[in-house]
Every structure is written in C-alpha cells, then in structure tokens.
C-alpha cells in the first residue's frame, strides 16, 4: 500500500534511484495505491546523465509492494521493498528501456504489457 509521502525505489534505467509519492491517482478520496496503480511522483535521488533529473514531477506505475498482492486462489505475493517504473507524461509508456527485478502478473490486467515484456521475471 503506497500513500502520499511514501518513498519508493525505481525499478528501471531511467536514471532515478528513489522517488516520493505525492498523489495517488483515481478519485479525490483515494488513499492507497497497490500493484498496477498509477501515482504522481517526485524524483528525490537521480544519477548524473540520466533521462530524469532530481525534482521532476512525473507519473509512475507501482510494480512491487511490501504489503503484497492477494491472488484469487488465496496466495499472497510479497516483496522486500516498494518499487515503481517511471512513465512518460503523454503516452504513459515506460521511460526506461530495462526493468530490474520481478514484477507481478497483475500488471497484465492493467494494460502494462510493455513492462511485462521488459521484466526479467513475471510472478
């Protein structure tokens, strides 16, 4: 569960290392974001010569959460850290060309097939 002020790692090669959630999209009273939800983020730490710079405000999709994802068969998939993939402002496609770490199958339902195809492992 990601909410405002939550810090996340970045799971792509866009140049950002850590980001802060500043808004959960999807309604005025929406409080939490889970895997597959889009959030508005601010870049807090970035590497030199990356595609994004510190202080930029962009959209991102959550790909891993510590809270986990509950499947219809009752199993729960949990991760050690919260992570997101940064999206392009206009097309909502990933900025990076590589995804690091596993992602969940729930992204397929949310129409993020590009992230699924770039990921090294889909759980």
From Swiss-Prot:
Instruction: Spell out the SUPFAM superfamilies in the cross-references.
Output: Ribosomal protein L14 (SSF50193)
One matching Pfam family: Ribosomal_L14
GO BP field: translation
Molecular function (Gene Ontology), one example: large ribosomal subunit rRNA binding
Q: CDD domains attached here?
A: Ribosomal_uL14
Q: Name one GO cellular component term.
A: cytosolic large ribosomal subunit
Ribosomal protein is among the record's keywords: yes
UniProt similarity note? Belongs to the universal ribosomal protein uL14 family.
Q: Cross-referenced NCBIfam families, in alphabetical order?
A: rplN_bact
Report quaternary structure and partners: Part of the 50S ribosomal subunit. Forms a cluster with proteins L3 and L19. In the 70S ribosome, L14 and L19 interact and together make contacts with the 16S rRNA in bridges B5 and B8.
Q: What is this protein called?
A: Large ribosomal subunit protein uL14
Q: From what organism does this protein derive?
A: Hamiltonella defensa subsp. Acyrthosiphon pisum (strain 5AT)
């Amino acid at each position: 569960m990601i909410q405002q002020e939550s810090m996340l790692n970045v799971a792509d090669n866009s140049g950002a290392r850590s980001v802060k959630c500043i808004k959960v999209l999807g309604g005025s009273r929406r409080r939490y974001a889970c895997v597959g939800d889009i959030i508005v983020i601010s870049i807090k730490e970035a590497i030199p010569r990356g595609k994004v710079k510190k202080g930029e405000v962009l959209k991102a999709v959550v790909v891993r959460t510590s809270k986990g994802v509950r499947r219809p068969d009752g199993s729960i998939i949990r991760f050690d850290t919260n992570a997101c993939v940064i999206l392009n402002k206009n097309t909502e496609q990933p900025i990076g060309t590589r995804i690091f770490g596993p992602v969940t199958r729930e992204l397929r339902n949310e129409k993020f097939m590009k992230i699924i195809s770039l990921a090294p492992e889909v759980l």
